[in-house]
Amino acid sequence: MTTSNPSKQEFLAILKSVLGESGSSPIALHEPNIGQRENELVSKCLASGWVSSVGEYISEFEQGLAKFTNSKHAIAVVNGTAALHVALHSVGVKPGDEVLVPTLSFVATANAVSHCGAIPHFVDSDPETLGLDPLALREHLRANASLRDGELHNTSTGRRISAVVPMHTFGHPMQIEALIDVAKEFNLVVVEDAAESIGSYVGTTHTGTFGRCSSLSFNGNKTITTGGGGAILTNDSGLAQRIRHLATTA
């Protein structure tokens, strides 16, 4: 579907148009800012004895995430890949399914699909947003997929296409509203990979709150970091209960 491949110079120009420049200094991928307050709070957490998946600080963090993103539920997990893996499993992605993912993303997006026993089905990215291209996706699905009994199937492989995972590259929102329309047309579950986009909005709506659920990452190269860590956002209370069960006991 892609008519041409951008050169290295063209690709760098696209990145700079999205990220901006700071004089002649390189733009760092990440610069963690860890100070005295962080040291004090980590020490308090260690002293409490609750240093894993539950405890005062986990609950406070989840509540803060939910409030900041205007989500009903935020469930903390070990990292962003685990967040996406649990999210996909919880919405019904099964072994042998295909899951639509963007061609431009960190490998964890596709890895989470593979962890479910499903097959990543790559879709063109938009050179302006660097996210999955919803118009290209609609064109591709109309030509290469069909609905049978309410489920979308790849006409070439015969496999069910059960979900689509848009990713907000470098925190820049992709055309999520247009993608939601495409997903409705083809009866696809939307699970957002919002690993890089905490603090990013479309209008007044935070990224990661458009789909059925979403994954966040707090790795050292993200907007906020816990060293490692991730979370899942959802407004579906039943789904949140299932996700929390899987995240804490499975």
Can you describe what each PLM-predicted range is?
Residues 1-90, 94, 166, 184:
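Conserved PLP-binding active-site segment in aminotransferase class I/II-type PLP enzymes
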Residues 8-9, 220-250:
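Conserved core segment of the aminotransferase class I/II
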Residues 42, 65, 83, 99, ...:
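Generic structural signal for small/hydrophobic residues in well-ordered secondary structure
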Residues 50, 106, 171-172, 220-226:
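Nucleotide-sugar-dependent glycosyltransferase donor-binding/catalytic pocket residues
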Residues 73, 95-98, 241-242:
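Short acidic capping loops at alpha-helix termini that bridge into adjacent secondary structure
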Residues 89, 93-169, 173-185, 189-194, ...:
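PLP-dependent aminotransferase-like
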Residues 192-225:
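Conserved active-site segment immediately N-terminal to the catalytic lysine
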